[in-house]
Design a protein with these regions (language model features):
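Extended acidic/polar, glycine-enriched regions
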Residues: 80-160, 170, 176-186, 194, ...
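Short, glycine/acidic-enriched loop or turn micro-motifs at the edges of active sites
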Residues: 169, 205, 372, 446-447
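Non-catalytic, glycine-rich low-complexity segments
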Residues: 4-13, 21-32, 40-86, 145-164
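Ligand-binding beta-strand-loop-alpha-helix segment within the catalytic cores
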Residues: 369
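Residue-level marker for buried hydrophobic side chains located in beta-strands
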Residues: 364-366, 440-441
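Alpha-amylase-like alpha-glycosidases and glucanotransferases acting on alpha-linked glucans and related
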Residues: 210-352, 356, 373-614, 620-622, ...
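Structured C-terminal cap/extension of enzyme domains
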Residues: 624-675
């Protein structure tokens, strides 16, 4: 790789080397670097192109007086300007409430070029918020967004406990084959009555309403809006006010429940038919108010849903004039599909109403899960295509478990376009997921710092890291979480740079402490008293074995049957048995597991004994379910995201049975000791 290409890559945040999972340096291929730069609209395909791009880098800041956006955290900031030397200059900050504050500091000249000067001026003390800087230079006014954010988020003052749930798996006797928002309300109400302070739920992001639905909550169509699959139709005001005959007709659409699988497609099809019966009774005023509140973002999503019903997915296969939200055919489409778009706005209103108020009187409340990205053919990718690197996907480099790397198939944010947009798209995302939330868990929180970009047509190992302005993204999170009164949790498992955890901790973002991963350098389990306090503690996650599954080696058996081990069954069994023996020995040494005691209870006792601010248990662990919700590396070979919660024998349980299970009551009594 030439020094010039390396210089260009560094300037755009594209890595030319990185440390792998074993902490060994890896050189990125020039082809991967060139591809990543191309995804940022930087031509680096030739020596001449690289030189031209370097010149452009040097000239670009001098073309406009103000930067695209200014972010200030934890105190007064400084503003950089590029103006004509000697020109009259007036600076003001326009506050988000309309007030104005003059910037009357003395500018300091840092550089000069071709009759222009690079100035830096100190900003006055400003209130937190989304403001605007206005610069009037020689009578011409330009502006840029200004974000003033707190330096640190507030973390829970008292330790608290709760449950982490896969909602779709918790089916009640009243739900239509899939755990729904009424079931979530039941979980929250039960947990609150027991003294719990938090409930973490899997991502509730919206799917594209075209069958078959993608069962993975981590590959959504939209992270800005929420899934209608979770609606309890009988809990809508439209149903409550309907005549008995219509209510009977709606209830008669309930599909039979498959005892062994969570089948979203028949459930959603039935709910859609039921909602269409109720649509003529929708509350016109409430819908108009909801549409006014959420504006263009909701209208674009609703239109996308209507168009997808007609043209299918992905949107890249739609008629060309409809492939952009500002395309030449969109105005006519809004007229032609106005009724159906209004219907999809109403569906989001119903979802919003059923999630409102959940957990608001708990110490933390309902914690939503934010997926790392969206389906390239879905609603957000269509509406936000200008700030996404379409054609590139997010994944992970090779490691000891995935020697070919991983490609998650999700297009990443473009860091340059986010900055140019003043981080407004990210603000909208954060505000959306914080609506009716006491907290947010950010999946793969390392993505605030960098993401592994895989070029189109390349293998997952043939990518490179692209960096983001983590301080700016954390500033957005900090301000919006402060305003929502919410806690932020980062999923920081696996290989994580030391600076990432330090930065997150300094910002008040809680980490994740998972029992399986809390080990020292030689792999020995750490006693819970040694875990970091600023974390959410759990035994496992959706991608890992359950407590009972780990003890029974169920994950080994399943991966062996599916040819997912990568080495011999005996080797894996020996490794897992060593891990289990070490874990049980640690629990015994800490006085958490007596001879003949229940190791699953002891694992939960370890969570209680830790200093972690939030401690969460899983209903699957409490009832003895052997099966993990998702088996990474599989698609159709394993029923990912389609398993109802079951007991140790594999018999599916209803939500009512789960809450009455003796194991749930025993673990609840243990967790109530969290202080």
């Amino acid at each position: 790789m030439t020094p010039a290409l390396a210089q260009l890559a560094a300037a755009h945040g594209v890595a030319t080397t990185y440390q792998d999972w074993a902490d060994s340096p890896v050189r990125v291929s020039p082809a991967a670097v060139v591809a990543a730069l191309a995804a940022l609209d930087v031509d680096a395909a030739s020596t001449e192109a690289v030189q031209a791009a370097l010149v452009e880098l040097e000239l670009a800041p001098w073309r406009t007086p103000l930067p695209p956006v200014l972010v200030v955290r934890g105190g007064p900031g400084r503003l950089d300007l590029h103006v004509e030397q000697g020109a009259a200059l007036v600076l003001e900050v326009v506050l988000e409430d309309g007030g104005r504050i003059p910037v009357d500091g003395v500018p300091v000249a840092l550089d000069r070029r071709d009759g222009q000067v690079h100035l830096q001026v100190a900003l006055p003390d400003l209130p937190l918020g989304w403001h605007t800087v206005e610069a009037t230079v020689a009578g011409t006014t330009t502006s840029c967004p200004l974000l003033v954010a707190p330096e640190r988020l507030a973390v829970p003052e008292q330790r608290t406990w709760g449950w982490q749930v896969q909602l779709y798996a918790l089916r009640s006797e009243q739900s239509w084959g899939v755990g729904d928002y009424a079931d979530l309300r039941t979980v929250v109400t039960s947990a609150r009555a027991d003294g719990a302070g938090a409930v973490l739920v899997n991502p509730l992001h919206a799917e594209t309403p075209v069958l078959p639905l993608n069962p993975s909550p981590y590959s959504p169509s939209s992270r800005l809006w929420r899934s209608p699959v979770g609606l309890r139709v009988e809990d809508t005001l439209e149903y409550a006010g309907a005549p008995a005959e219509l209510q009977q007709q709606v209830s008669g659409l309930r599909p039979p429940t498959d005892p062994d699988r969570v089948l979203r497609d028949p459930s959603f099809a039935a709910k859609l038919a039921a909602l269409e019966l109720l649509w003529p009774r929708h509350r016109v005023g409430a819908l108009a108010q909801f549409r006014h509140l959420h504006g263009g973002g909701l209208e674009d999503f609703a239109l996308f849903c209507a168009l997808a019903e007609v043209h299918g997915t992905p949107w890249q296969d739609w008629p060309e004039q409809l492939r952009r939200p500002d395309g030449p055919g969109i105005a006519a489409a809004r007229v032609a599909h106005a009724e159906r778009a209004a219907f999809w706005c109403w569906v989001q209103l119903l979802v919003d109403e059923q999630l409102a108020g959940l957990g608001e009187d708990m110490a933390v409340g309902l914690v939503h899960d934010l997926a790392v990205g969206v389906d390239a053919g879905g609603a957000d990718a269509w509406a936000l295509q200008d700030v996404l690197a379409l054609g590139t996907t997010v994944g992970a480099p090779p490691d000891s478990f995935n020697q070919q790397g991983q490609d998650w198939g999700l297009p990443p944010w473009r860091p340059d376009r986010l900055r140019a947009a003043g981080y407004a798209p990210y603000r909208a995302l954060v505000r959306g997921v914080l609506r009716h939330a006491g907290g947010v868990r950010i999946d793969h929180v390392m993505g605030l710092f960098r993401l592994w970009w895989v070029p189109e047509g390349a293998g997952a190992a043939e990518g490179t890291y692209v960096s983001y302005d983590a301080q700016a993204l954390l500033a957005v999170l900090a301000l919006e979480a402060l305003r929502a009164g919410a806690v932020i949790v980062g999923e920081d498992l696996g290989t994580v740079e030391a600076r990432v955890r330090t930065t997150l901790d300094d910002a008040g973002v809680l980490g994740s402490a998972v029992l399986w991963f809390e080990t020292d350098d030689d792999g020995s389990p750490l006693p819970p008293r040694s875990w970091r306090p600023a974390a959410l503690a759990s035994i496992t996650t959706h991608d890992l074995p359950t407590a009972a599954g780990f003890l029974a080696e169920e994950h080994v058996r399943v991966r062996h049957e599916l040819d997912q081990l990568g080495h011999s069954l005996q080797t894996e069994q020996e490794r897992v048995r060593t891990e289990r023996e070490r874990l049980l020995a640690m629990l015994g040494a800490e006085g958490l597991l007596s001879e003949g005691g229940d190791p699953v209870l002891a694992m939960h006792a370890a969570l209680v004994a830790s200093p972690c601010r939030i401690v969460l248990a899983s209903y699957a662990d409490a009832v003895g379910d052997l099966r993990q919700p998702n088996l990474p590396g599989t698609v159709e070979q394993y029923p990912n995201w389609r398993l109802p919660v079951a007991d140790a024998s594999g018999t599916p349980l209803t939500l009512e049975q789960v809450l009455a299970c003796p194991g749930v009551r025993r673990i609840t009594a243990l967790l109530q000791q969290v202080r």
